[in-house]
Amino acid sequence: MQNTELLLKKLTLEEKCALLSGAETFKTRGMPEHGIPQIWLSDGPHGLRKQAGESDHLGLNPSVPATCFPTASAVANSWDAALGEEIGAALGEEAAAQEVSVVLGPGLNMKRNPLCGRSFEYFSEDPYLAGKLAAGYIRGIQSKGVAACPKHFAVNSQETRRMASDSIVDERTLREIYLTGFEIAVKEGHPRSIMSSYNLVNGTYANENKHLLMEILRGEWGFDGAVITDWGGSNDHALGVKNGSTLEMPAPGGDSVRELLAAVESGKISESDIDARLSELLPLVFDTKAALDAAPREFDAAAHHALARRAAEESLVLLKNEGSLLPLAAGTKVAVIGDFAKNPRYQGAGSSMVNSTQVDVLLDKLIDSELNVIGYQQGFDRHGKPDAALQKSACELATQADTVILCMGLDEIAESEGLDRSNLRLAQNQVDLLQAVAAVNPKIVVVLYSGSVVETPWLDNCQALLYAALGGQAGAGAVADALTGKVNPCGKLAETWPLAYADVPSAADFATRRKTVEYREGLYIGYRYFTTAEKAVRFPFGYGMSYTTFAYSDMVADEQGVSLTVTNTGSVAGTEIVQLYVAKKNSELFRPAKELKGFARVTLAPGEKQRLTIMLDDKAFRFWNVKANRWEIEGGEYELLVGASVEDIRLCEKISVHGTATVHPYEDRDLDCYYKGDVLHVSDADFEKLLGHPIPKGKTKIDRNLTLGELNHARSPLGWLVWLVLTILLDVSYKRGKPDLNILFQYNMPLRALAKMTNGAISMGMVDGIVMELQGFWILGLVRVIYEAIKNVVLNAQMEKRLRGA
């Protein structure tokens, strides 16, 4: 094992700077002459995506086969941190087998709005639940000697303009909603690394945000690992290094090294800043490489497939079961309808896409079951094209069956990295099919596949609804077993399903192309809004049915937590997820009506009862006091609410809590809309009162951070032409129903990323020349680009020669 302190004394400043950026898309720099190995990083929130051939960061090129587990959005419905730890351990095993040192996951973004195209990669709208699950994944991954890298830190809630948007959020909301999940993950999971997000937070890029990285992450939480940029996410590398960012990825080449050298020479940063970052990076490199050298180069694919199936079983959510239609008895004549039954959708699109070791198919699993499958019909075109013939054939089959199993859902491109959803609806051809089938056979079980929320105005057309989410490569077997009663669905929703998208508090301006993203709703995301505003929803947070029933009784409560008895009052074994919420009545602060502060799973046989204890931690009663700039507790009476969902509260006890707050955070601000939870249309004036300062107005500037999608603002025909070509290509891909992820990435990419993602082929000086061209200085800009290109080639060659010791 290398001694980092001694090694730093041997390295030249140039060598040190070179180590703080990647060498290839998913590899760090190695320096064999100093005993520093090169290590692999790989995407892997729900399955490893190591690309042995040509690498890319969007999941476009094939990767090495790996187990595709249910997505985070699915596993969150299990409310099972221990299951997350098992999945994490399997991910760690596969990473070690493929010589990957860092797994880029889990994803911890808060689900502010269900239209976020990447919601399937994230756990929940609740930071406590998300943090607990993420900590489990992290512990599991790192138990195999591999480093976990939770992402994206922080306040990154949309794909639109994700590389250049500025999240404007008040400090209390930042702390209580968007950072608490990361805090739990860091303190309880102890990750070796963390990935910064692309966006700015209150005017400063997350990757160079001193408040986030140095004051909170490293200072308050004690994180001592490596902060890794998202791919192409570095804006000012030197400022990032100074303020706590460790490794710039993927491969910016020699220009990045020269940037740091110049910053040291100018006094912008010091060599001690460089050393501090290397003291975070090098132990990770040495430790993971040593663990990988001792790890087996194979894993038990069958065992991991079985784990993926069990994870899918625990993640299924039964949303409707009218007349106890489910489970289906052996011998039931069933018609299987829907393209998803034969061509499964089990994961999302983008950088998390896994090349699965195998994929189970629901139709095959149903045929192998004790049901009498009388036939299958596709029923609809999965990409939304109307097809009367498909619908007619499906209806004809439905008339011959006792029960119809209809598989519906979102197609592959509806949920993807780089692209936010345009609505929460299922394709109309699927809804039309459901209505047509219901007219000839009302006994319909809908199996729904999606990575996030969908509107369900069609719910009355089916008798049962089983939410399969994106269940991974073994999800089909789990669904078949749930339909036939071999498995009792026990999952509960980790996010609220509204009646309509318009009810979501951030609906009015989510994913606009403005430079600023204003978090006007404050604390009120998800159930925190719906319960406070007393707004009806389709399915509340924490909701999920079972084939059995449970009774809660004999609750005892104090400041430490609660204990209660749970009894299975039904006729079959089942698992109940008991949820503990905290409510403060007559609060002097504005706050959500109730907040999740604990949960527990219990599996019981029919008639069995068990005593449960749910402990409260140091986050149970705290709030961020924006005036005192610290965590405090408001004293007084609290209600501890125990229930089967946020709306289905079974037991309640009141306790008295000693307070610490001495200064009222909002005594001089009129924030009536926040006290009422009336945040659907927050005015500029009210939001500025919450922020404590004027709302920043993002203006389009022709500089390094101009995105390619904004080149129509350029003063150059070349810029207009590039913008026009990209726009046309994007429109064509949309019309084909298959948006091009590569074009989408480029469209939202700032010019500076050209210098961060081309392995040194383009320097920042060349980007500055392009900016001059776009500003209208056509000839000077062209000359600058040519000059900087020649200079870049020469300097890169000289630097590589020095680093090789030639």
Range-by-range predicted roles:
Residues 1-619, 623, 637-641, 646, ...:
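Glycoside hydrolase catalytic-domain context in secreted enzymes
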Residues 646, 653-723:
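Charged, amphipathic alpha-helical linkers/stalks
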Residues 618-665:
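Terminal connector regions
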Residues 689-806:
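Long, low-hydrophobicity ectodomains and other hydrophilic envelope-associated domains
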Residues 47, 368, 507, 572, ...:
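A generic signature of intrinsically disordered, low-complexity regions enriched in glycine/proline
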